[in-house]
């Protein structure tokens, strides 16, 4: 056997993989050949063995046609599968034949199934093997699998891609070859056995047929006997359950059964073997059959595609009943009820209960809105009655609605008992029925009749459904028989009762489904009627079916002529209009045959049937276009027939022939005389000749026209008075469209109002009131639907054209208001019903269409109130009305809004009322109507913006996204009340901030493409990138326009948008100052900067924007400075950039002319001076003034760059002092005087500084802050005392003057007046007394500071004590500012004071630390010094320039150790390893006193932790170790230690011998020790395991370590004394 490479070999070559598959196929073929040889030789055992081995081969275990197959494209593999499976199946059958000859009791079924499986796999590989299909058919016949047998026989006719065509096979038998005739005979026998062939096959020549009769392939194989009945005697019984026990449920079940039958029945229309049994949970049948569905293999259950939209889902298990319902399953009592939103408390009282800033309180809302409006308009009502005494005023209250109480009662009952789904026959006709303005002949035929709308009424006698179910189950009907039985039961008379068709009123859905069933079994019904023409009941059935089909054809014609679609057309299979027409003609001829066979002596029921038939035939003639003469003749005959017996019929379920009476016939005859007029109208509308349409309709519709001269118009007008209301509305709508297209809006508006008036006249007519309740309520529902559409049309006109009412007179407006109020009063009934439903006092209607209808009513309510307001506002313009519109109109709007402030009523009708109310309130008086505007904005856009008097409430309205146009409209209002500015400070409200953020996002920047805006943008950006130079500062302070910024006019930017970005930035900045300050919200401040820059691009000369922008940049710098000391060092460039831009914005604000008051000017001066002073002082002193520009100069050696000269700090502080002084002159504020004194002190002018400090202390309040944040204000008082102590120590001011200042301080110490007495003593005594007085005053001030916030007095007390020689007390005072002795992590024990500049806190920490170190030296406090260092090392976040201070400590510390112990610098020169080991061992045995120096360096190395360069510490550590090393080595005898004399035993080699050099280096590395090894060995001496050895001597080591600190402290002191009292250590830093 050939060898092969497996697939998991190392190589990944595709050719090798392909070769591997070929080898496997070759091996399998070899096994297949061996199996065939064994089978040929008759060795069944060997063949079985080979076949088992073959089928277990890897490539044959996976079927080649599966999705996951890797070899499905290999033809050789497919052939191998095909041959193996086919021959294996034949081998199994052959082996079974041998076994049966030996043992006849062998069960053949398993072998048949295995062989059938093999044949199936073989056919999947090659489906063109006709012989193999015949094998499958014969095996399926033996197994009694008719479905498989039939499929195999049909497949033997057409293989490959040709589908089986039964019609072609059974009609073209002569074209079949002999091999297919046997299959045809077998298929015929099978279908005949199943009852699926209605007609026999065409006659064949039996002799020829016998020649082609082939014998059986397996004649000796037996057919097993199954223990079940024959298949043709065992149909499948389907048990279905009613969804609910009504005719609706039975109808759904019948329709569902037909759909199941259509899916299960083959395409040739073979009879169904599916028997339907109906079951109901609530109805107990007399003969209850607990039948199980048999497993039939002929038909499948349900198609895998699932049921369509008209079917229901069947249950998977037979034990579960099947609901035959195409809408929803039956409701369960345990289902949770939907939670409805209840109406909240009316918020009108809330709105009017707020303080109204002196405004009149609005009238509170009442329960009855119409009574409230009547009370508001009582004066207007009197004026109308006085002007028009005979007219009915629309504002007379409830008295106007009394005559319409019956309408209100009918509508209330209709809503309480809302019709179920589809229970109204037809409400599809609306004002939109004139599609494209065309007048259709179907509109004339349909709408000229009175409305046939009725509510569904389908009650059945008790026990009828139970009897119906029992009869159905006893007859064992198939779906078609069940459908026929149900149709007959609905159309056949019941003993002495008329049929349900005439007795019940069917809803639209029921009628459509019933018509669908009739269409599906029409041929059966036709044959049934045709077979029993003389039966009395057949006339009822045939005539009713004729009327149903005629009604269906009529509705189809109507919808096709109007280009409309019915809502439920998609649920029923549609047919062409021509087929519907032919069907009606077919049933017309059939009913004529029935009429001819009726007896001459006719009963009343037969006479009524003949009348119905005559009317239907006449209507069909009209629909098919018959001549008018024949139609008139038929109507005359029908009139005589009706007059003979005074008959009058009413067909409850017919749309096209609802009422049959003499009056209707007369009306139809008169209608035929108007055909010419309406044909002309039809052609004009079709040609879109609107002027001609107006000319046609104006004379017959307008009531003010005279008809004496035009008899045709008079006749048409009289005819229209007899027509239905729907038809009249249709004509008015045509006239409305014509007026609109002819650009006559006022006339079109009057047409819409006239339609509303016509509907109202119809609802108040006697003919409407005498109808039965069901028909009256159905028509009322349709009329109100008309009015809803008209409301939408009218409001659209009024909204789009505000001046459309200008030509309208007073009476027309009053009449329109009255009509609108009546409709609103009708629709308001729904509000009460909705209240009851939400409060669960009444149940919600089960009709799913109720929600959509409810939304329609809500839309009608709000659009109707918009129409009423518009008409009422126009009425106030007339001269005879004397009323204050600005006060009256907002009351109307507020009353309406408060009445509908629940469950989203106010947002209905596409938020038309909210938009109207908001717009009108802004137009009338935005300030007075602020609350209503806020509520409208909240309901429309979900923007909750509260004022100081009112916060809007949620009305559960559906909000919309805010658009740019909407935002622009509300910008002036929001900016008018929300932005209350006071020199940069804005009332911070989060809701206003969020609202303005949304508005700014919606409105795009208006000047993106304008050249002037772009110029301003570039100029401002370039200006903010400049350095601060003396020239620039001088030019800006002289108010020179150096930027040349351009003004942006109103043509480029809308004035309403111009202040938006300014207002938003002010609100955001105010929000930051009140809530976010100190939280390092950099991103929020950058957003504020963005809005300020956008405002400056549009308004470059707005001084307040430049000034506040400077404050924002300063806040950015403050946030970075106040976070941590480390952040100051990391973000120094960013902080300097913020400070530089803040100063530039200040300069730009100063360059613009001041237009505001002195206080604003003083604030600008003060902030500018503060920015200068803060930038010139630590931390980051003068960094903002460093120039980044360079100049290029030409020298002897070429061009070179020279940096610009920086500004001197003295000039910056002097400029700040000038502006502090100007701010103090304008505002007389203590802060300006306080900062002026500090600036003068830094400039060296102590005398003026003391003057300003004293003035600031006199003006300063006792406490700062407000509320619980109040704290004692001591800054100006401390500054005065501190500078007096400095002046006394320095001698810059005479002592007498100092004493004079001290006598005038606000908080003098107790019992210290003697210290200030002048007794001609020594000046030094006066100086000492002054310092003692200041000490006591500072101590008294510190006692007043109960919160211990202020730390500066403690520092100043320590400085004075040191000067007086009491260093120990000075140190104790300073130690209170630190917490290094406790176990906490923080070093500083000071707090940020309210008036402390950001960043100064960390600078004070550095100053205090340096000063405390010097005091430790002076007091020789070594232990506290070491503890302080340990805590100081971990305090980098609170100490400014922490690293630099630590470096200074380490440098002095190591130098002091080197000098104290005389440690020399040494170099390690290849110490021998043997020698080092011996000496190191001796060193490790030394006592702690000799190792104390190394231990001190080890401790400081651990404490340093890399902050100071570790290599320098290690160098000093090595120096200390080598000093000890040499000392120990010198005390050891070389002979005792066996130490070699030479440091290395490696002999020298020539330089050119590279191998020798490498050997020497390797040996050297093994015999010498390096510097790194020395450090590691020294550190090993003091590892944690040796800590127990030194625990007893720890105090001694600490003392030695502290003794070395004296040089360090001394160095600090010496540096300070040499440089004078430097500001970095000894001077107070403000």
Curated annotation (Swiss-Prot):
Domain of life, per lineage: Eukaryota
Q: Which PROSITE patterns match?
A: TPR
Q: What is its main location?
A: nucleus
First and last residues of every TPR repeat:
8-42, 1230-1263
* Segments for region (Disordered): 325-347
What InterPro entries does the database record attribute to this sequence?
Hir3/CABIN1, TPR-like_helical_dom_sf, TPR_rpt
Instruction: Cite the Gene3D superfamilies for this sequence.
Output: Tetratricopeptide repeat domain
Record's keyword annotation contains Acyltransferase: no
Q: Which GO terms describe its cellular component?
A: HIR complex; nucleus
Keywords in alphabetical order, please. Chromosome partition, Nucleus, Repeat, TPR repeat, Transcription, Transcription regulation
User: Where does it localize?
Assistant: Nucleus
Q: Which GO terms describe its biological process?
A: chromosome segregation; transcription elongation-coupled chromatin remodeling
On whether Transmembrane is a keyword of this UniProt record, the answer is no
Q: What does this protein do?
A: Has a role in a nucleosome assembly pathway that is required for the integrity of heterochromatin and proper chromosome segregation. Required for transcriptional silencing in the outer repeat (otr) region of centromeric repeats and the Tf2 long terminal repeat retrotransposons.
Family classification: Belongs to the HIR3 family.
Q: How does it assemble?
A: Interacts with hip1 and slm9.
Protein name as catalogued: Histone transcription regulator 3 homolog
Q: Which organism is it from?
A: Schizosaccharomyces pombe (strain 972 / ATCC 24843)
């Amino acid at each position: 056997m050939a060898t092969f490479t497996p697939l998991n070999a190392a190589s990944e070559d595709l050719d090798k993989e392909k070769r591997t598959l070929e080898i496997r196929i070759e091996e399998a073929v070899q096994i297949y050949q061996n199996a065939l040889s064994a089978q040929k030789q008759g060795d069944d055992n060997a063949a079985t063995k080979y076949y088992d081995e073959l089928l277990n081969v890897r490539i044959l275990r996976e079927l080649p046609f599966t999705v996951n197959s890797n070899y499905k494209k290999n033809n050789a593999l497919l052939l191998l599968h095909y041959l193996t499976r086919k021959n294996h199946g034949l081998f199994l059958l052959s082996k079974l034949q041998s076994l049966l000859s030996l043992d006849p009791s062998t069960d053949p079924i398993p072998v048949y199934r295995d062989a059938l499986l093999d044949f199936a796999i073989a056919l999947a590989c090659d489906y063109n093997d006709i012989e193999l299909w015949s094998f499958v058919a014969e095996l399926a016949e033996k197994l009694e699998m008719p479905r498989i047998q039939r499929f195999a026989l049909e497949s033997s006719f057409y293989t490959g891609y040709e589908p089986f065509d039964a019609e072609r096979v059974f009609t073209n038998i002569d074209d079949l070859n002999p091999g297919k005739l046997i299959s045809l005979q077998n298929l015929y026998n099978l279908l005949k056995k199943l009852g699926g062939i209605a007609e026999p096959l065409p006659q064949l020549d039996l002799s020829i047929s016998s020649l082609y009769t082939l014998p059986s392939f397996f004649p000796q194989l037996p057919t097993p006997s199954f223990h079940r009945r024959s298949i043709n005697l065992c149909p499948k019984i389907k048990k279905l359950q009613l969804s609910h026990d009504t005719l609706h449920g039975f109808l759904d079940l019948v329709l569902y059964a037909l759909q199941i039958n259509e899916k299960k029945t083959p395409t040739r229309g073979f009879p169904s073997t599916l028997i339907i049994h109906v079951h109901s949970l609530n109805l107990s049948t007399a003969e209850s059959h607990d039948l199980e569905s048999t497993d039939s293999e002929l038909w499948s259950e349900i198609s895998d595609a699932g049921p369509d939209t008209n079917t229901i889902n069947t249950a998977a298990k037979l034990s579960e009943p099947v609901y035959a319902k195409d809408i929803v399953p039956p409701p369960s009592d345990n289902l949770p009820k939907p939670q409805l939103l209840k109406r909240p408390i009316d918020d009108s009282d809330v709105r009017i209960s707020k303080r109204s800033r002196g405004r009149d309180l609005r009238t509170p809302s009442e329960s009855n809105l119409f009574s409230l409006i009547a009370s508001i308009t009582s004066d207007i009502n009197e004026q109308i009655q006085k002007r028009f005494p005979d007219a009915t005023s629309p504002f007379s209250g409830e008295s106007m609605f009394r005559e319409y109480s019956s309408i209100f009662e009918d509508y209330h009952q209709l809503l309480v008992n809302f019709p179920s789904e589809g229970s109204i026959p037809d409400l599809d006709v609306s004002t939109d029925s004139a599609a494209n303005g065309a007048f259709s002949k179907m509109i004339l035929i349909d709408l000229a009749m009175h409305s046939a709308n009725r509510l569904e009424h389908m009650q059945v006698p008790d026990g009828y459904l139970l009897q119906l179910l029992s009869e159905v189950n006893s007859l064992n009907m198939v779906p078609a028989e069940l459908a026929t039985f149900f149709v007959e039961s609905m159309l056949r008379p019941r003993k002495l009762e008329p049929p349900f068709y005439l007795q019940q009123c069917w809803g639209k859905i029921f009628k459509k489904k019933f018509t669908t069933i009739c269409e599906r079994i029409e041929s059966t019904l036709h044959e049934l009627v045709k077979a029993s023409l003389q039966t009395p009941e057949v006339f009822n059935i045939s005539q009713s079916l004729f009327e149903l089909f005629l009604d269906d054809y009529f509705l189809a014609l109507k919808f096709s002529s109007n280009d409309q679609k019915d809502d439920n057309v998609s649920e029923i299979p549609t047919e062409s209009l021509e087929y519907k027409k032919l069907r009606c003609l077919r049933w017309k001829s059939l009913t004529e045959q029935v009429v001819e066979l009726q007896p001459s002596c006719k009963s009343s029921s037969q006479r009524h049937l003949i009348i119905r038939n005559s009317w239907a035939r006449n209507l069909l003639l009209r629909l098919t276009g018959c001549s008018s003469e024949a139609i008139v003749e038929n109507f005359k005959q029908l009139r005589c027939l009706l007059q003979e017996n005074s008959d009058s019929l009413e067909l409850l379920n017919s749309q096209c022939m609802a009422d049959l009476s003499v009056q209707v016939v007369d009306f139809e005859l008169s209608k035929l005389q108007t055909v010419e007029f309406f044909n002309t109208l039809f052609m004009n509308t079709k040609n879109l000749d609107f002027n001609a349409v107006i000319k046609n309709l104006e004379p017959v519709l307008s009531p003010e026209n005279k008809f004496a001269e035009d008899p045709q118009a008079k006749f048409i007008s009289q005819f229209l008075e007899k027509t239905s209301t729907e038809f009249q509305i249709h004509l008015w709508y045509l006239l409305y469209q014509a007026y609109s297209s002819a650009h006559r809006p006022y006339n079109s508006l009057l047409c819409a109002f006239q339609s509303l008036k016509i509907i109202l006249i119809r609802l108040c007519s006697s003919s409407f009131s005498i109808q039965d309740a069901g028909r009256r309520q159905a028509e009322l529902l349709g009329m109100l639907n008309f009015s809803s559409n008209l409301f939408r049309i009218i409001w659209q006109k009024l909204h789009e054209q505000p001046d459309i009412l200008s030509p309208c007179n007073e009476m027309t407006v009053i009449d329109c208001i009255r009509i609108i109020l009546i409709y609103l009063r009708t629709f308001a009934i729904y509000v009460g019903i909705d209240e009851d439903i939400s409060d669960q006092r009444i149940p919600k209607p089960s009709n799913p269409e109720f929600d959509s209808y409810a939304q329609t009513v809500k839309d009608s309510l709000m659009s109707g109130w918009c129409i009423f307001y518009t008409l009422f506002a126009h009425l106030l313009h007339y001269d005879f009305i004397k009323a204050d519109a600005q006060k009256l109109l907002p009351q109307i709007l507020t009353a309406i809004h408060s009445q509908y402030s629940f469950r989203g009523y106010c947002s209905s009708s596409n938020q038309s009322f909210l938009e109207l109310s908001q717009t009108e309130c802004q137009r009338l008086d935005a300030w007075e109507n602020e609350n209503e505007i806020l509520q409208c904005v909240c309901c429309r856009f979900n923007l909750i913006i509260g004022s100081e008097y009112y916060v809007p409430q949620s009305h559960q309205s559906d909000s919309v996204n805010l658009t740019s146009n909407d935002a622009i409209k509300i910008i002036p209002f929001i900016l008018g009340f929300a932005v209350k500015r006071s020199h940069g400070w804005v009332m911070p409200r989060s809701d206003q901030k969020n609202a303005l953020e949304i508005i700014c996002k919606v409105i795009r920047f208006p000047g993106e493409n304008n050249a002037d805006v772009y110029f301003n943008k570039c100029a401002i950006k370039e200006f903010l990138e400049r350095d601060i130079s003396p020239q620039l500062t001088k030019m800006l302070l002289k108010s020179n326009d150096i930027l040349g910024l351009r003004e942006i006019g109103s043509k480029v930017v809308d004035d309403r948008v111009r202040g938006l970005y300014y207002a938003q930035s002010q609100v955001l900045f105010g929000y930051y100052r009140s809530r976010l300050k100190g939280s390092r919200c950099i991103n929020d401040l950058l957003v504020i900067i963005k809005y300020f820059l956008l405002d400056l691009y549009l308004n470059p000369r707005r001084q307040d924007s430049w000034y506040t922008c400077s404050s924002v940049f300063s806040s950015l710098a403050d946030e970075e400075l106040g976070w941590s000391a480390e952040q100051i060092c990391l973000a120094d460039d960013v902080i300097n950039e913020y400070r530089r831009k803040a100063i530039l914005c200040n300069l730009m604000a100063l360059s613009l002319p001041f237009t505001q008051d002195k206080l604003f000017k003083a604030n600008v001066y003060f902030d500018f001076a503060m920015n200068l002073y803060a930038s010139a002082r630590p931390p980051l002193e003068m960094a903002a003034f460093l120039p980044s520009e360079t100049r290029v100069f030409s020298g002897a050696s070429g061009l070179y760059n020279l940096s610009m000269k920086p500004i001197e700090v003295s000039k910056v502080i002097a400029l700040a002092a000038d502006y502090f002084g100007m701010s103090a002159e304008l505002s007389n504020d203590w802060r300006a005087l306080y900062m002026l004194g500090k600036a003068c002190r830094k400039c060296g002018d102590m005398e003026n500084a003391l003057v300003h400090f004293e003035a600031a202390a006199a003006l300063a309040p006792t406490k700062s802050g407000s509320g619980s944040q109040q704290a004692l204000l001591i800054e100006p008082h401390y500054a005065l005392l501190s500078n007096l102590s400095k002046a006394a120590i320095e001698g810059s001011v005479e002592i007498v003057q100092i004493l004079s200042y001290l006598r005038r301080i606000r908080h003098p110490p107790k019992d210290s007046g003697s210290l200030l007495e002048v007794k001609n003593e020594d000046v030094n005594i006066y100086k000492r007394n002054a310092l003692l007085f200041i000490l006591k005053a500072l101590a008294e001030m510190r006692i007043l500071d109960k919160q211990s916030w202020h730390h500066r007095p403690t520092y100043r007390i320590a400085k004075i004590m040191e000067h007086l020689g009491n260093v120990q007390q000075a140190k104790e005072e300073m130690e209170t500012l630190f917490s290094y002795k406790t176990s906490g992590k923080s070093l500083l024990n000071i707090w940020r004071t309210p008036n402390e500049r950001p960043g100064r806190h960390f600078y004070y920490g550095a100053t205090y630390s340096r000063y405390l170190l010097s005091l430790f030296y002076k007091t020789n406090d070594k232990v506290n010094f070491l503890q302080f260092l340990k805590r100081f090392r971990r305090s980098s976040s609170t100490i400014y320039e922490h690293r630099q201070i630590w470096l200074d400590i380490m440098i002095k510390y190591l130098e002091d150790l080197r000098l104290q112990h005389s440690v020399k610098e040494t170099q390690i020169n290849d110490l021998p390893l043997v020698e080092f080991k011996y000496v190191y061992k001796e060193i490790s045995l030394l006592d702690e006193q000799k190792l104390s120096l190394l231990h001190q360096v080890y401790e400081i190395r651990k404490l340093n932790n890399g902050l100071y360069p570790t290599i320098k510490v290690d160098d000093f550590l090595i120096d200390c170790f080598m000093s000890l090393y040499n000392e120990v080595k010198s005390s050891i005898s070389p002979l005792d230690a066996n130490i070699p004399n030479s440091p290395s035993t490696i002999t020298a080699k020539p330089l050119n011998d590279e191998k020798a050099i490498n050997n020497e280096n390797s040996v050297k590395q093994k015999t010498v020790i390096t510097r790194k090894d020395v450090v590691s060995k020294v550190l090993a001496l003091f590892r944690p395991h040796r800590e127990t050895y030194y625990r007893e001597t720890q105090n001694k080591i600490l003392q030695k370590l502290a003794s070395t600190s004296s040089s360090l402290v001394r160095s600090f002191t010496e540096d300070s004394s040499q440089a004078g009292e430097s500001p970095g250590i000894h001077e107070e830093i403000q």
